[in-house]
Amino acid sequence: MKANYMNMEEFPLDPTVFRREYAHANTIATCPNDDVIINWRFNNTMAMIDHQSKKIKWSLNDIEYGQHHDVQMLENGNILFFANGADVHIHGPETGSQVVEIDPSNNKEVWSYCGSPRRSFVSWFISGCQRLSSGNTLICEGLWGRLFEVTPEKEIVWEYVSPFFVEYDHPAYTGTNVIFRCYRYASNSPQIQNRLPK
């Protein structure tokens, strides 16, 4: 990957999507070390850009994750993301989504959550995750409007399914309760401070 373009041979387009939308960036986030991490869903690539040099310092391209969303660097330096599992033509109809934490020094998984059976947790688009200060992970299974929290041991602490159905601008998802992403905020966090009822 060069500074101003992606080599299509090195980072090929996912075979399930149209060429007209080669990359489909769905995450651009600042890391704790001030670098920037970007995720391109349609070619299964995430990359970290050095804030000072503007050069790519790390990348991962792996179709096994079936496209992904909400890529983020954790305080421990690992990378957390929602692996959609969208490529059923490769992985088979009995696979599903997962939330994955990898060590970017070797791109090895250090933690993951998936459904049991695998198809009990699946969202082929949107969705996200957040590592909480408790060590638990908040998960948004966007396709089904499901929010839930799991412990490091992968036990579900609580879950919520949105009862709100809306018209979505896609013929396959009209009249659904999809949720793009979710976040948990402390009551005194700057995002919601002074907005909560007394």
Q: What is each model feature region?
A:
Residues M1-K198:
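Histidine-/acidic-rich catalytic cores in large beta-rich domains
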